[in-house]
């Protein structure tokens, strides 16, 4: 038979090539050794524990927020209930005070202002003109003169300041 190369011969030749090749060409694989496996597994476990811890922490924060919102809602409801129950008592107290007290009750200012505004005359005439002195200060009202419009003095009519610098 001629030269037939069997599969076993090829495997043995490959093993010889690998054993004679330079070992520095093969990169270091930490997972190939025992302590490398331990290191990789430890790192993976630490990452998983960290993720679980962060999820648990966020869940606790969410629960606290929900609990505080419920407590706030309960206090608002209890305050509202107290106000409703005390409003009847306060109305009875006000009625009692009205019957026995001599002092008038407070009325809101808005009602007084509306009543006062209704009593005022409504005209579209402007106020009478006024008299001003040289300094622009109010002196008094001008006697009514038909068609005369008095204006305060302008700055142009004031005397110019004198410079005493020599």
Swiss-Prot record:
Region Disordered, annotated ranges: 73-93, 123-166
Compartment(s): Vacuole membrane
Domain of life: Eukaryota
GO cellular component: fungal-type vacuole; vacuolar membrane
Residue intervals passing through the bilayer: 34-54
Keyword field: Membrane, Transmembrane, Transmembrane helix, Vacuole
Entry membrane topology: Single-pass membrane protein
Name this protein carries in UniProt: Uncharacterized protein C630.04c
Taxonomic source organism: Schizosaccharomyces pombe (strain 972 / ATCC 24843) (Fission yeast)
């Amino acid at each position: 038979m001629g030269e037939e190369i069997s599969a076993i011969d090829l495997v043995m030749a490959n093993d010889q090539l690998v054993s004679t090749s330079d070992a520095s060409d093969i990169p270091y694989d930490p997972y190939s050794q025992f302590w490398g496996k331990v290191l990789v597994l430890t790192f993976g476990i630490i990452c998983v524990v960290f993720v679980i811890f962060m999820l648990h922490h966020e869940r606790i924060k969410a629960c606290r927020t929900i609990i505080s919102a419920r407590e706030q809602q309960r206090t608002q409801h209890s305050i509202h209930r107290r106000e409703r129950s005390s409003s009847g008592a306060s109305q009875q107290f006000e009625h009692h005070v009205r019957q026995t007290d001599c002092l008038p009750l407070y009325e809101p200012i808005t009602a007084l202002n509306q009543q006062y505004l209704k009593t005022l005359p409504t005209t579209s005439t402007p106020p009478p003109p006024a008299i001003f002195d040289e300094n622009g200060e109010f002196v008094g009202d001008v006697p009514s003169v038909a068609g005369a419009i008095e204006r305060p003095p302008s700055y142009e009519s004031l005397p110019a300041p004198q410079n005493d610098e020599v």
